[in-house]
Structures are given as C-alpha cells and as structure tokens.
A protein has these predicted regions:
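C-terminal binding/interaction regions
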Residues: 80-129
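Short glycine/serine/threonine-rich phosphate/pyrophosphate-binding segments
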Residues: 29-31, 49, 53-58, 75-77, ...
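Short, ordered loop/turn segments at secondary-structure junctions
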Residues: 12, 50-52, 65, 71-75, ...
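Solvent-exposed alpha-helices and their adjacent loops that cap or buttress functional pockets
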Residues: 31, 36-40, 58-61, 70, ...
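General beta-strand structural signal in soluble alpha/beta enzymes
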Residues: 7-9, 46-49, 67-70, 89-90, ...
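Hydrophobic alpha-helical bundle architecture
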Residues: 40-41, 46, 50-66
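Ordered, amphipathic secondary-structure segments that act as subunit-interaction surfaces
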Residues: 7-50
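Short, small-residue-biased leader/transition segments that mark boundaries at the very start
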Residues: 1-3
Length: 129
C-alpha cells in the first residue's frame, strides 16, 4: 500500500457540474491517534488546520514528513483546486468518506517541516515581543 499525502477535509456535497463541494480544511488533531502509524507506512505530507501532537511531530521528523496548513473558511475557493475526486472507502460516511483527490495549485503554507520546526510555536514567540 502506498500512502503519500493527506488533506483533512469534510466537503459539502457537490452541486451539478462541480467536482466537489466546498472543501476547506478540518482540524488535523482529530487524526493524531492514527497519524504516527501512517507516517511509518509512508505518508509524507498532510494538509489541514491546527496544531499537531508531540507524537505526530516526532513521527514526522523520523519519517521526513511535512504538515501544511490551508486557510480555514476558504472552502469554496480551495475546492476549485480539486480537479478530480473519487470516493475510495467508507462511502456510507458521506462527507467523511475517504477520497482520492487530484489537486493543483492548492494555496498552503508549511507549518511544520521535516525537522520539526513549527511555525505555530516560532510565530508565537516572535509576535509575543
């Protein structure tokens, strides 16, 4: 099994002519329980919003993975970057189903790099002054 990248989202239903409905990021920490194992099996990139646990950050460093943040509240705009969406598991979960997505030019920023440098922490220190 090849696990490459994950975008944590719960899209709204697609309207006629749309690939997917509004597709903004969801809180990534809800997946922290499962993430270290996925990283150990080959996951290299994650897109979502919010902080990650110390266990996830350690697993990212161990596996050379990166965590990107997408802007919350911009789901309608972000959905335009999704060129193809296919439900591949748990169709009965509706918007929470697992999808294979083809994405182009998704505007994200690196918030935790492969070395564990964490923008959420460094920015807090910088702007505290």
């Amino acid at each position: 099994m090849c696990i490459r990248d994950r975008y944590y989202l719960g899209p709204s239903p697609a309207r006629e002519g749309q690939v997917i409905g509004s597709a903004g990021p969801t809180t990534s920490s809800r997946m922290d329980k499962y993430t270290p194992e996925m990283l150990d099996k080959g996951l290299k990139g994650m897109v979502g919003k919010g902080k990650r646990s110390p266990e996830v950050i350690e697993a990212m460093k161990r596996n050379g993975a990166v965590y990107f943040a997408a802007v919350g509240g911009a789901g309608a705009l972000l959905s335009k970057c999704i060129k193809k969406a296919e439900v591949i598991a748990y169709d009965d979960l509706g918007t929470e189903a697992i999808r294979k997505l083809e994405i182009e030019n998704l505007p994200v920023i690196v918030v935790i790099d492969k070395d564990g440098n964490n923008l959420y922490e460094t920015a807090k220190e910088k702007w505290k002054k």
